[in-house]
């Protein structure tokens, strides 16, 4: 996903690209925005920008290593970049269950981030719907978010900032995504 494919939020796009261009990439960020504000697409574009070669404020040359996503996730994002949690549950076939990010997932995150990056560059961990982390998961990730390995970036994406535990929030740079302007939405 490219920044040019994201509707509106120009000030946030500029902030994110300037931080990378100036070598000031925060190790932990929390993108907070209601459904439809573009927080998830922005996080994906930002991750690509951090991981890939950039020209003119975009990831134009790509990086095959950054395309190692789960097949179902990639399919959903390609078809519906502004998807919501219900769409993801539907894609997984768990329409009637309540999603939660548990300690097992936290263990997998810790394990994957202890590995060196493929080409010695950044490692970016996106955690979508971060408010779904249970307390055990949040506590397991806390130390890693506080003191991540070199060139490791966490981007947590949430709709409800108040449901994120305060110790996690205090370690993140928080970016709020306002509702899209009517002029951005018009065809």
Regions found by a protein language model. Name each.
Residues 39-41, 135, 163-167, 183-184:
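Switch/connector loops and helix/strand junctions flanking conserved nucleotide-binding motifs
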Residues 2-136:
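Clamp-loader machinery-focused feature within the broader ASCE/P-loop NTPase space
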Residues 114, 139-156:
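Conserved catalytic/switch belt of AAA+ P-loop NTPases
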Residues 136, 140-145, 160-171:
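Short regulatory helix/loop adjacent to the ATP-binding pocket of P-loop NTPases
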Residues 25-27, 120-122, 148-152, 162, ...:
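Short glycine-/polar-rich loops that comprise or flank the Walker A/P-loop
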Residues 8, 129, 156-157, 176-177:
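Small/polar loops that bind or transfer phosphate-bearing groups
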Residues 127, 133, 148-165:
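Sensor-1/coupling segment of RecA-like P-loop NTPase cores
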Residues 165-187:
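Conserved AAA+ ATPase core "coupling" helix
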